[in-house]
Regions:
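Topology signature of small-to-medium multi-pass alpha-helical membrane proteins
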Residues: 1-140
Length: 140
């Protein structure tokens, strides 16, 4: 991982990690009520950002892999939120859907940039990502 990519990934991990941790400590416990394991899951997801930030700052491969995994999970959740809003759901419960749409779109963009800067978009193919996929099928 190059120095500029590590710097960009560290900055994006700090931004998204701060937002996820703030949501986990402030918003999720009040929103989920009795479903406290969901709030704990959001808090752990926020803390995982800072663990990946530590790994990337040290230049280790596990930090890059954790940052890629966080980008995939966060991007998937953000895309699911945009899809829910497109289907007329109001996941934030407020009168204005535009604020929620902007927040979810911003989060999706941040996780997309995090995935790119952490090195997921390398076009190495399916074989490198998955060890169980048979090699001869990839040469069709």
């Amino acid at each position: 991982m190059y120095r500029g990519s590590r710097l960009a990934a560290s900055f994006l991990l700090f931004l998204t990690g701060s937002a996820a941790t703030a949501i986990g400590f402030g918003v999720a416990p009040a929103a989920v009520g009795g479903a406290w394991p969901l709030a704990l899951l959001v808090i752990l997801f926020g803390i995982a950002h800072f663990v990946a930030l530590f790994g990337i700052a040290r230049g280790s491969e596990w930090g890059r892999q954790l940052a890629i995994t966080i980008a995939e999970i966060g991007g998937g959740l953000s895309f699911a939120g945009l899809f829910a809003i497109a289907l007329s759901a109001n996941p934030f419960g407020g009168p204005s859907v535009a604020n929620g749409t902007g927040l979810v779109a911003w989060t999706l963009a941040m996780y997309l940039l995090l995935g790119i800067s952490a090195g997921r978009v390398r076009f190495d193919g399916w074989q490198r990502r998955s060890a169980w996929w048979p090699t001869p099928l990839l040469r069709i």
